[in-house]
Design a protein with these regions (language model features):
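Interdomain hinge/lid region at the active-site interface
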Residues: 31-101
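Conserved Rossmann-fold dehydrogenase catalytic segment
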Residues: 1-15, 33
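N-terminal glycine-rich phosphate-binding loop for ADP-containing cofactors
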Residues: 17, 21-33, 60
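Short alpha-helical scaffolding segments that buttress acidic/His motifs in well-ordered protein cores
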Residues: 10, 17, 98-101
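Amphipathic alpha-helical coiled-coil segments
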Residues: 107-109
């Protein structure tokens, strides 16, 4: 169903990404004070969805499993592009990727 595909792209991946980032930070930053002191508005906005209910999101992710898995794979490919550009000290490629991502501004004003 096309609705499920689009929902996986614009809603479900945002929640999964937020949950994963929160887990990454919580695992690395054992001292909660560091998280609080260093957290910027961008971080807070990004992990805001990690406060969402597991009881609500588990069935949603299970019901739309195939689409969510496809979107996660696509997301990981994009993360790999950033990782490779950063590892290669390729500022031009990093800039290119960011400019490409900035096109979202035309959609989300």
């Amino acid at each position: 169903d096309s609705h499920d595909v689009h929902t996986a792209y614009v809603s479900h991946i945002s929640h999964v990404t937020s949950f994963a980032l929160a887990l990454t930070v919580l695992e690395t930053e054992k001292d909660e004070k560091h998280i609080f002191d260093l957290a910027s508005g961008g971080f807070s906005s990004t992990v805001r969805m990690a406060k969402s209910s597991a009881e609500m999101w588990t069935p949603i992710l299970e019901q739309n499993r195939d689409n969510v898995l496809h979107v996660i794979d696509t997301y990981l490919e994009k993360m790999r592009l950033f990782r490779d550009a950063i590892a290669d000290y390729d500022g031009g490629r990093i800039t290119e990727l960011i400019h490409e991502a900035n096109r979202i501004k035309k959609i989300l004003r």
